[in-house]
Amino acid sequence: MGDVEKGKKVFVQKCSQCHTVEKGGKHKTGPNLHGLFGRKTGQAEGFSYTDANKNKGIVWDEDTLMVYLENPKKYIPGTKMIFAGIKKKGERQDLIAYLKQSTSS
């Protein structure tokens, strides 16, 4: 499991320009991530997803996020997420630990 505080820094640096995490947070370029764990791809209410995201049909958890965050366009070809990914496994683990805490409270 990753370090939540380090993960928060990763989120602020690499994700917060497009995403929010708090309950009731607004969608930006990317969807609000509250309730992410256990939700299927392309299901955040009120966000306009590509068909690729809606049709991927996986459920977000630690394992699916580890693969997705390494290379989003490889995992979901056709996603509109313009992000190259996080190559360092430790950074992904930290980010996922932060997301698990921040998107469920």
UniProtKB/Swiss-Prot annotation:
Task: Report the record's Gene Ontology biological process terms.
Answer: mitochondrial electron transport, cytochrome c to oxygen; mitochondrial electron transport, ubiquinol to cytochrome c
Top-rank taxon, per record: Eukaryota
Query: What post-translational modification does the entry describe?
Result: Binds 1 heme c group covalently per subunit.
Its annotated compartments are: Mitochondrion intermembrane space
Task: Name the positions where heme c binds.
Answer: C15, C18, H19, M81
**Which PROSITE patterns does the entry mention?**
CYTC (PS51007)
Locate the N-acetylglycine modifications and list their residues: G2
The entry's function note states: Electron carrier protein. The oxidized form of the cytochrome c heme group can accept an electron from the heme group of the cytochrome c1 subunit of cytochrome reductase. Cytochrome c then transfers this electron to the cytochrome oxidase complex, the final protein carrier in the mitochondrial electron-transport chain.
Name the UniProt record assigns to this protein: Cytochrome c, testis-specific
Organism from which the protein derives: Xenopus laevis
